[in-house]
Structure formats: structure tokens, C-alpha cells
Amino acid sequence: MDAQYNPRTVEEVFRDFKGRRAGLVRALTADVEDFFRQCDPEKENLCLYGFPNEHWEVNLPAEEVPPELPEPALGINFARDGMQEKDWLSMVAVHSDAWLLSVAFYFGARFGFDKNDRKRLFGMINDLPTIFEVVSGKSKAKPPSANNHSNSKSKSSNKTKSSEPRAKQPKPQPQPPVKNEGREEEGGPDDEEGGGGGGGGGREEEHGETLCGACGESYGADEFWICCDICEKWFHGKCVKITPAKAEHIKQYKCPSCSGGNGGGGGVSGNGKRARPS
């Protein structure tokens, strides 16, 4: 009914949206008695219109077919006396929200908004409470959701920060306890074996460098390593086919050499998975 007004930019369409929205909110809140009175069920199909100048109007639908602009819900007056007033106003509010979006994106389609324009327009619209939220009193829940969003971002940021030190640790934290438990379970004889084989690993650490027992490469800050509970040598997880998740379930880890495999082929105590010799 105001087809002569045609916004052409994202900002103009959003300004048009806000004006129409303000008029509809006023009809359903501050001017609700007047709006209720005008929606006489005895009249013909009536629609609630909002205009860019923040005014509203209850009127018959446009006569031209198809209409220049999308039309709001038709016949809102018929349900007025058959519902609780609060429920009826909520129903009109929901239909009004849908109409506002259809008008805004009608302009977007007509004037060739691209993907980024449409995304920006929707973001600007979505920052406002819906008419239904205002009428039903749920718009007060909007600010907390924004806070929750920022909190979730800070939490995810904290998780990222806290994960960085763990990635830079020279040796994975869960492994030393696993090694100690394995030695206690094995008892004295295994301790003697571990003591004999661990001398080399200790000398490597004394010199400030840990070498992989499989490939001979030095430790990398972003790599997962695992220690053999028998010979106390460290290995790249990828070299012995052990992942951090799999290591969580291993009570005692034996490298391929200490596992007694055929020709040096390795095994893991507890799950029988074979590791490829390097």
C-alpha cells in the first residue's frame, strides 16, 4: 500500500524494516485497545499494516493482483473473539514478524542484493527482538543470550589457550603415571630389565635431547610421544601406531622391541594391535 517507497541499499531496507516494525509494535502494545476495536470480526478480511514512518493501519488487502509488495496475514479480525486476547495478539505478532521479513527480502531480491548483502541485512534484523518477543514479554531474554554468546567465545578461547601449553610439553602428562603403574605390576624382574634399558634414555635426557627409539628423530613440540615401560625409551606415537586416545586405555606400554614380536615387530599389551617396524 506504500509501493512508491522503494529502499535500494541494505541500510535503507533496514531503516524501512525498523519503521514498519515500530508501527506494528505500537499497534500491539501502546495502541492495543484501538487495534483491538478496529479488528471487528463482523467486518471483511482485515490486515495489519506497518509503514516506514512508524505508523500502523488495519485495512482491507490491496486490490491489485498480484500486489506490489507482499501482503500481511489476511483475516486477523475473524479470530479475535474466539481466542484469549493474549493468544490472539501473539498470533498477530508472529504473522507480522513473517511479513516484515518477506518485505525486507522482497526489496533485497528486487534490487539485486548479493549473498553478503543478504547476510548483513539478516544480521542487522536479527539483532532486534521480534515483535512476538516484545508482545509476549520474552524480549528481556535477548541481552543474556548475547552475553552467553560472548561467554561461549571466551570459554572457547580459554580452551584454546589452555590446550597450547599441553601441546608444547616435552612429554605427555598421562604417560609417567602409566609407566610407574606398569613397573609396580611387573615387579622386581621387570624393574631390573627396565633399569638396564633405561640408562640410554636417561643419558639422552641429561644431554637435553630426546630421540625417538624408532626413527631416531628428536622431539617436536607439537608431536605426541609415548614411553616404553620396559626399556624406558621414548617413541613418536605415529612411529609405533599409538594415538593419545589409545594410550589412555593402555595399562603398560611395551615398544615393538620389548613386546617379543616376530623379528622386532611390536605389540601393545592389552589390545593386540601390531605396530609396523620402522
From Swiss-Prot:
Low complexity composition bias: which ranges?
145-160
What SUPFAM superfamilies has UniProt attached to this entry?
FYVE/PHD zinc finger (SSF57903)
| GO CC annotations on file | nucleus
Q: Where is the composition biased (Gly residues)?
A: 260-270
Concerning PROSITE patterns, the annotation shows: ZF_PHD_1, ZF_PHD_2
InterPro entries named among the record's database cross-references: Alfin, Alfin_N, PHD_AL_plant, Zinc_finger_PHD-type_CS, Znf_FYVE_PHD, Znf_PHD, Znf_PHD-finger, Znf_RING/FYVE/PHD
SMART domains linked to this entry: PHD
Protein keywords: Chromatin regulator, Metal-binding, Nucleus, Transcription, Transcription regulation, Zinc, Zinc-finger
Q: Where is this region: Disordered?
A: 138-207, 259-278
Which Pfam families is this protein grouped with? Alfin (PF12165), PHD (PF00628)
Q: What's this protein's family per the entry?
A: Belongs to the Alfin family.
This chain's protein is named: PHD finger protein ALFIN-LIKE 9
